[in-house]
C-alpha cells in the first residue's frame, strides 16, 4: 500500500538500505527516518528491548550466564550493530557509523512494567477500531 507515514523498527531501515534486492535499496531513497517525541518536554521515542534471564531451576546456570555475558559483551554488541542495525545495550560500546548517521534521539523512559500494565486496555482499543 501507499501512505505518508509508517512506523517501523529502525533496524528494518538499515536492512532495506543494504538489501541485496535492488528494489528495496531504491525504496529507501524515498524514506526518512525520524524519532518521534523529541521536543524538550516530550517523552522520547519508544524503544524495544530484548530480555534474557536464567531459569531458577536451570541445570546449566553457568552456561546460561556465560551466554548472557557474551551477548552483552563488546564483541557481540558490535555484531548486533553491524549486522542487524541495533543500538548497543552495553554502554562501553559505541554505535556503528550507520546508526550514528541517523542522529541522536531521546528514548522514552517509561518503565516496561507500566507498558505491560496498559497492554490489555491498548489491545481493547486496537480491537475496537479494527487496526
Predicted regions and their residues:
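Ligand-binding pocket segment of bilobal, Venus flytrap-like solute-binding proteins
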Residues: 1-34
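Solvent-exposed loop/turn segments at secondary-structure junctions
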Residues: 11-14, 38-41, 59, 73-74
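Stable alpha-helical elements in mature extracytoplasmic
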Residues: 12, 60-64, 76, 122-125
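Short glycine/proline-rich, acidic loop/turn segments that cap or connect secondary-structure elements
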Residues: 39-44, 85-104
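A bilobed periplasmic-binding-protein/Venus flytrap-type ligand-binding module shared by bacterial periplasmic
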Residues: 47-60, 79-83
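Substrate/cofactor-recognition hotspot
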Residues: 67
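Periplasmic-binding protein-like
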Residues: 70-94
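Extracellular/periplasmic bilobal clamshell ligand-binding domains
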Residues: 95-131
